[in-house]
């Protein structure tokens, strides 16, 4: 089983944690942006089937 030889420094831990948090923040902001563009109908890369509220006659 692999065991680290030396203790990881606090600053390195903070750097790695910030990278991990930044990835999550970017994914969340991208998802929010896509949701906004879909809800306004300005999305060019995501197709949503439009349903009409009118009853068929």
From Swiss-Prot:
Plastid among keywords: yes
Q: Name one GO molecular function term.
A: structural constituent of ribosome
State the UniProt keywords alphabetically. Answer: Chloroplast, Plastid, Ribonucleoprotein, Ribosomal protein
Among the Pfam families in the record, one is Ribosomal_L32p
Q: Name one GO cellular component term.
A: chloroplast
In its keyword annotation, does this UniProt entry include Ribonucleoprotein?
yes
Q: Organism's domain of life?
A: Eukaryota
Subcellular location per UniProt equals: Plastid, Chloroplast
Where is the major localization of this protein?
A: plastid
SUPFAM superfamilies linked:
Zn-binding ribosomal proteins
**What does the entry give for GO biological process?**
translation
Question: Its family?
Answer: Belongs to the bacterial ribosomal protein bL32 family.
Q: What is this protein called?
A: Large ribosomal subunit protein bL32c
Q: Which organism is it from?
A: Calycanthus floridus var. glaucus
- Gene name of this polypeptide: rpl32
